[in-house]
């Protein structure tokens, strides 16, 4: 769990997202409160529940980007899901409890990655021994092994071809749920697990170079050193205390007045979410997960529906409400220039691989921002995503001819932007910009 202060979290988010300070502050405080709760003792720790968040704002204003950056920052089990992917229990499709099962799998991957780092040195020793066995045989004299060990460490044998034996992977075999028992204690059963347990792990011999063999051998040796039960227990503890779920497109499951049909299932999804957000126990194949202390952050554009169209009980379970503002021309200009990996920096880096030096003048940046705002106001407003469409249009010719212009410096100024796109922005027919 990250120990960043709210100010540091907001500062980190500022590197990638322009504006939306209210939303940044809300998620920063929520994340810090997770850390504060873990410092409490006994009964008080159990009583402090997370304050779930509802983010409301037009498309392309930064809701999903906040979630993406928060996931990297949190250092905790984090899952982003679209609410539209789920159906009411009894309908064909995934039920909402699958969110928690997926969160557990995410946590297991995280814990394994941490363990792998701590076991790396020990695993490397085992890999070295297995590579020596493949090179000189298990019964070779010690002097021969020592001689080859030195060559191996010096990197002289990296391209030598050897034959190694690896455990057969079973993870890609199909999985299924028990009939009539969604979320049963065993959850999804893997056919691969059944065969592995009944027949034992099968192995497969394969030929590869020493360099290529290192990675799969390291993964296998690390896996052998891990205590799987301890990893699962640690992952479950991490999910129950630090887990964060980001529910995107929550507005798409609102049941609107005067509408029937599919709205029945939408309202059912909301009802299924209620106990999950309030706190319940979800059975997974790794054990039972209590959701009381999992933080839920919901977001939606609410173009057609209103937040009040959500079930009152669900509104009550999302007590912190944050409104994100639509982006203006100045915001677009800052997005193009000030963010850590802005679109301009991305295009400059991409074309630099062809030996082309791309330069944008400040006037060109202002012109790009202005065109994006004009197009957004004329057709559907898709926020900052419009910049990608505009940039692609402006740099279409440069991207196409870049291999023939190696060593050149290409300056993009306001006149160049106007020439490639200005007349289209003034035209009422803007169909080519609609994504």
UniProtKB/Swiss-Prot annotation:
Signal peptide: none
MF-aspect GO terms: ATP binding; ATP hydrolysis activity; peptidase activity; proteasome-activating activity
GO biological process: protein unfolding; proteolysis involved in protein catabolic process
InterPro entries per UniProt: AAA+_ATPase (IPR003593), ATP-dep_Clp_protease_ClpX (IPR050052), ATPase_AAA_core (IPR003959), Clp_ATPase_C (IPR019489), HslU (IPR004491), P-loop_NTPase (IPR027417)
Domain of life: Bacteria
Locations listed in the record: Cytoplasm
Entry's Gene Ontology cellular component terms: HslUV protease complex
Presence of the UniProt keyword ATP-binding in the record: yes
Transmembrane domains' residue ranges: none
The entry's keywords: ATP-binding, Chaperone, Cytoplasm, Nucleotide-binding, Stress response
CDD domains: RecA-like_HslU
Chief place of localization: cytoplasm
Residues holding ATP: 18, 60-65, 248, 313, 385
Keyword Nucleotide-binding assigned: yes
PANTHER family noted in UniProt: ATP-DEPENDENT CLP PROTEASE ATP-BINDING SUBUNIT CLPX-LIKE, MITOCHONDRIAL-RELATED, ATP-DEPENDENT PROTEASE ATPASE SUBUNIT HSLU
Assigned protein family: Belongs to the ClpX chaperone family. HslU subfamily.
Function as written in the Swiss-Prot or TrEMBL entry: ATPase subunit of a proteasome-like degradation complex; this subunit has chaperone activity. The binding of ATP and its subsequent hydrolysis by HslU are essential for unfolding of protein substrates subsequently hydrolyzed by HslV. HslU recognizes the N-terminal part of its protein substrates and unfolds these before they are guided to HslV for hydrolysis.
Subunit structure: A double ring-shaped homohexamer of HslV is capped on each side by a ring-shaped HslU homohexamer. The assembly of the HslU/HslV complex is dependent on binding of ATP.
The protein's name: ATP-dependent protease ATPase subunit HslU
Species whose genome carries this gene: Beijerinckia indica subsp. indica (strain ATCC 9039 / DSM 1715 / NCIMB 8712)
